[in-house]
């Protein structure tokens, strides 16, 4: 083996790792909505959690990425430790899918079917289709599909190149001695753990082992301990990601480590015992691509079958290893680790934006109530809720900007932009709730009151504002276009009401039934309520924008009048419903 073989091997390894990386990232983007659906199905059901972990890892081709995601979920309070344990065990089995795909490189034979199954036969076609999709199609999902095909083709080409380059190693005595050394179970396990810890991917390290098996010098006696060690080495990524997290998130990372350590210790003991007592002839045979895939899968399935039923005991063990803090820990509302899976991070942002909307709606409801029946408790509660909406805007705005800077799908990018726009409207509604409370406080402090006619008119307007808030917020939560289109007619009615109330107040001033001081407060209240309607209209516009893939809110609001055939009818219905006639 000369320097050119070494360079070819390095090039093949580089292409292999690069292909695996871009294929995994593209799969993640392409399957974003599916990942969100899987997350939504997570329950305390042990088997469902296990299957979820298996499915997610099979999709994104990385148990490390899944485990880091789980650590982020636990840190954010999305998952309990018990749920996380089930998902982590599923991830360990899901990661074996990659080895089975790579085992296609080891197929040998001259029949037509075998030749069609060999990667060298079909990867050029996949690469051609992939580059056509990527270069000539504009849809981001189709581009991601192209990148998946290109990544897979690059991965398989790198595997073939690496396998061909290492065949010369079979004549190198030092290489033979190295794998003879690794047939020692402890050394083999350490070697597998170190290699995987360095490249931070058990799928990649198993692929490298499969490529090295092409030399014929890798026996099952060496391959099996190395595979066990690879499963321990892959825990490094999750352990590093748990630094600075909550106790439960640290426990989730340690569960991943303990699962693999316990499984390795038990399986290694059984392996050593069987080797000493029975001297199986197969251990001296050269490992194959397929054989390594079988060993990798068997190890993870055995570990899962052994530890899944005792998940509660594993949970108790890590709780003893990482005891609870004396003071309750704050749960991270938005965990940076979730950014490694943008679609999941976006779903978390949507959930928190929904919570922000609930807080703003609560503040506004209390603000409206304070106009009718003021109390210091209401005032204090509204101020707390308004501060909370400010906090939501700060953390979500920063997080969504970071998320938007990542390479995400067109649909996710549009949703992130929609959330960024909606944040400001929810926050401003919280501000206007505070404005209403301040007006109520002024009335209370100065012992002012509105006339009977003014109170009736204000009650009509507040009911209309209450309905538009409920309608627009519901449209946002449910992505309901029907409700979104109903907002603009009601907003027009609110604008008309505000103008009528302003004119009526001027008439009352002229008649002497209202004072100038109450007039200032009246004007402030009308302005706040009218602006709440405007922000609700903007929120509905964001929903329409997202449905039309066009983030021009003003255009969306204009189209709401054009596209909504029932606009005039709905306007008349709302005008009648909120008529000022007693």
Please place each PLM-identified region on the residue numbering.
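Cytosolic, long alpha-helical scaffolding segments
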Residues: 79, 105, 218, 244-250, ...
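Membrane-embedded alpha-helical segments of transport systems
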Residues: 59-66, 85-102, 119-125, 155, ...
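Membrane-interfacial helix-loop connectors
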Residues: 69-91, 99-121, 196-233, 242-248, ...
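Hydrophobic core segments of alpha-helical transmembrane domains in multi-pass membrane transport
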Residues: 9-22, 53-57, 125-137, 150-162, ...
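Helix-loop-helix hairpins and the membrane-proximal interhelical loops
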Residues: 1-46, 145-194, 212-215
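Short helix-coil transition sites and intra-membrane helix breaks within transmembrane domains
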Residues: 24-28, 56-65, 166-167, 195-204, ...
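Alpha-helical transmembrane segments of multi-pass membrane proteins, especially transporters
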Residues: 13, 33, 37, 41, ...
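Alpha-helical transmembrane segments and their lipid-water interface positions
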Residues: 15, 28, 64-68, 95-102, ...
């Amino acid at each position: 083996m000369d320097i050119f073989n070494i360079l070819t091997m390095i090039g093949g390894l580089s292409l292999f790792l690069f292909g695996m990386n871009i294929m995994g990232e593209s799969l993640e983007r392409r399957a974003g909505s599916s990942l969100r659906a899987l997350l939504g199905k997570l329950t305390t059901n042990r088997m469902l959690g296990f299957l979820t972990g298996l499915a997610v890892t099979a999709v994104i081709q990385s148990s490390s990425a899944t485990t880091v995601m789980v650590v982020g979920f636990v840190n954010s309070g999305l998952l309990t430790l018990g749920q996380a344990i089930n998902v982590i065990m599923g991830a360990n089995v899901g990661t074996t899918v990659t080895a089975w795909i790579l085992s296609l490189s080891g197929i040998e034979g001259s029949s037509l079917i075998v030749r069609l199954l060999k990667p060298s036969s079909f990867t050029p076609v996949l690469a051609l289709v992939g580059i056509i999709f990527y270069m000539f199609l504009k849809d981001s999902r189709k581009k991601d599909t192209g990148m998946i095909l290109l990544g897979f083709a690059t991965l398989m080409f790198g595997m073939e190149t690496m396998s061909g380059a290492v065949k010369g190693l079979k004549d190198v005595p030092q290489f033979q001695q190295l794998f003879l050394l690794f047939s020692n179970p402890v050394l083999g396990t350490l070697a597998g753990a170190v290699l995987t810890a360095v490249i931070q991917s058990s799928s990649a390290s198993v692929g490298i082992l499969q490529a090295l098996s092409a030399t014929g010098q890798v026996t099952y006696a060496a391959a099996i301990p190395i595979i066990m060690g690879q499963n321990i080495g892959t825990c490094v990524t999750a352990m590093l990601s748990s630094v600075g997290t909550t106790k439960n998130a640290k426990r989730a990372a340690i569960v991943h480590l303990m699962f693999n350590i316990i499984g390795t210790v038990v399986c290694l003991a059984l392996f050593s015992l069987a080797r000493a007592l029975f001297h199986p002839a197969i251990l001296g045979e050269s490992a194959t691509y397929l054989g390594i895939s079988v060993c990798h899968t068997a190890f993870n399935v055995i570990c899962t079958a052994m530890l899944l039923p005792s998940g509660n005991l594993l949970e108790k063990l890590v709780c003893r290893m990482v005891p609870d803090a004396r003071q309750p820990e704050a749960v991270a509302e938005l965990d940076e680790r979730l950014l490694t899976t943008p679609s999941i991070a976006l779903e978390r942002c949507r959930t928190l934006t929904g919570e922000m909307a609930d807080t703003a709606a609560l503040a506004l409801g209390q603000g409206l109530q304070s106009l009718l029946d003021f109390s210091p408790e209401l005032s204090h509660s509204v101020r707390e809720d308004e501060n909370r909406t400010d906090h939501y805007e700060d953390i979500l705005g920063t997080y969504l900007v970071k998320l938007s800077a990542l390479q995400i799908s067109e649909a996710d990018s549009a949703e992130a932009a929609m959330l960024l726009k909606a944040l400001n409207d929810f926050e401003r509604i919280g501000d206007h709730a505070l404005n209403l409370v301040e007006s109520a406080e002024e009335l209370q402090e100065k012992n002012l009151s509105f006339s009977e006619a003014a109170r009736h008119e204000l009650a009509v307007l507040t009911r209309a504002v209450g309905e538009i808030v409920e309608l627009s917020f519901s449209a946002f939560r449910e992505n309901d276009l029907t409700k979104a289109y109903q907002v603009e007619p009601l907003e027009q009615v609110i604008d008309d009401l505000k103008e009528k109330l302003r004119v009526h107040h001027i008439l009352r001033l002229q008649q002497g039934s209202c004072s100038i001081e109450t007039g200032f407060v009246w004007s402030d209240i009308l302005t706040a309520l009218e602006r709440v309607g405007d922000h609700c209209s903007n929120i509905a516009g964001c929903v329409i924008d997202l449905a039309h893939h066009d983030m021009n809110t003003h255009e969306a609001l204009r189209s709401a009048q054009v596209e909504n055939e029932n606009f005039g009818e709905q306007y008349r219905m709302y005008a009648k419903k909120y008529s000022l006639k007693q």
